[in-house]
Amino acid sequence: MLKQIRPAIVMIVFFTVLTGLVYPLGMTGIAQALFPRQANGSLIEKDGKVIGSELIGQAFASDKYFHGRPSAAGNGYDAGASGGSNLGPTNPKLIERIKGGAEKLKAENPNQPVPMDLVTTSGSGLDPQISPEAAYFQVPRVAKARGIDEAKVKALVDGQVEGRELGFMGEPVVNVLALNLALDAAK
């Protein structure tokens, strides 16, 4: 019987070592060698201190900053609680949350339609980007809070718009953290 079980045990140990150690360590080594910034989380540093990642959204509450999408991930962009709200399109809680968010934003900028991504969460709840329309919608509030010309703020948004991936996939987006850092740098 041991003769029959031995090949199975050898294969289990072999593939456990291959897929559990060799492959992950090999891929980590290749990623660190070829793409070190991305392999380490695409972290953004300011004055030698990590302030965020290009890949994870952050909550910005001040009117002096652009705000990202609402987060369904725990208590405000908690990466450990990543996930959608799982509320269906007819769920009263979802409808009420969207209406409340839209009313608040409409009061802030009554002459513009509220972009959907400013009132709806993403699948992960952690998206770092918003649409250019959502960024332009916030320009008057940010310019007023900072006491600077709207045209200057709009130009900063224009400079932060990232086009479609490979020229045809997805939609143009604006990374909120990068935009807010550019805003701070422009003063």
Swiss-Prot record:
InterPro entries: KdpC (IPR003820). GO terms for molecular function: ATP binding; P-type potassium transmembrane transporter activity. Pfam families: KdpC. It comes from the Bacteria. It is a single-pass membrane protein. Disulfide bonds: none annotated. The chain crosses the membrane at residues 7-27. GO terms for cellular component: plasma membrane. It is found in: Cell inner membrane. Keywords: ATP-binding, Cell inner membrane, Cell membrane, Ion transport, Membrane, Nucleotide-binding, Potassium, Potassium transport, Transmembrane, Transmembrane helix, Transport. PANTHER family: POTASSIUM-TRANSPORTING ATPASE C CHAIN, POTASSIUM-TRANSPORTING ATPASE KDPC SUBUNIT. NCBIfam families: kdpC (TIGR00681), PRK00315.1 (NF001454). Belongs to the KdpC family. Part of the high-affinity ATP-driven potassium transport (or Kdp) system, which catalyzes the hydrolysis of ATP coupled with the electrogenic transport of potassium into the cytoplasm. This subunit acts as a catalytic chaperone that increases the ATP-binding affinity of the ATP-hydrolyzing subunit KdpB by the formation of a transient KdpB/KdpC/ATP ternary complex. The system is composed of three essential subunits: KdpA, KdpB and KdpC. This is Potassium-transporting ATPase KdpC subunit. It comes from Mesorhizobium japonicum (strain LMG 29417 / CECT 9101 / MAFF 303099).
